[in-house]
Amino acid sequence: MPTVGVFNKEGNKVADMELNENVFAAEINEYALHQVVVALLANKRQGTQSTKTRSEVRGGGIKPWRQKGTGRARQGSIRSPQWIKGGIVFAPKPRDYRVSVPKSMRKVAMKSALTSKVQDNQMIVLDSLNFEAPKTKSMIEMLKALEANKALIITAESNEVVYKSARNIQGISVIPANNINVYDLLKYEKLIITKDAVSKIEEVYA
């Protein structure tokens, strides 16, 4: 079983913790990671883009000049794509970009992402994470002690105090354990996670 150190908010190591090898020491599947990240980004798209084709642009119903005898190139409508204010060729229309990924692949990708953080020594386990009140200064001091500039903080439950303490810090994001996703795990350089959150993740993915 992989073992990691457990730290307090001051950055001091207080204990060691064994991790579930089925979750944090799994085989890294790059194909699954790619498929899930592509799907997550595609599913974020609104798909509301819309421009007009030549049949939808107002005007242009009359031929601008006769077919022959003017010396100019033949034209059928002033709303053809080559004209200023003409329609758009293959105009983008509203569409659904949603991509479905099998649940088993999502699970493999999640284990791969968590394993990569452990292997790269980028996962920091905290014994607890609580502040008396929302204070950005307290969060900055903790991040400095843990040497984390760009980090994803995972808590066991939604914690408004922790969230408010971190929301004004660039490169830091806070999410509860039940909302983690592969994209966020890979996007941030370091993963800061509480012991309770580790247990929750192991319950779901082990």
Swiss-Prot record:
One of its GO terms (cellular component) is ribonucleoprotein complex. One of its GO terms (biological process) is translation. Residues 47-77 are annotated as: Disordered. It comes from the Bacteria. It holds the Pfam family Ribosomal_L4. GO terms for molecular function: rRNA binding; structural constituent of ribosome. The keyword Ribosomal protein applies. The keyword RNA-binding applies. Keywords: Ribonucleoprotein, Ribosomal protein, RNA-binding, rRNA-binding. Belongs to the universal ribosomal protein uL4 family. Part of the 50S ribosomal subunit. One of the primary rRNA binding proteins, this protein initially binds near the 5'-end of the 23S rRNA. It is important during the early stages of 50S assembly. It makes multiple contacts with different domains of the 23S rRNA in the assembled 50S subunit and ribosome. Forms part of the polypeptide exit tunnel. This is Large ribosomal subunit protein uL4.
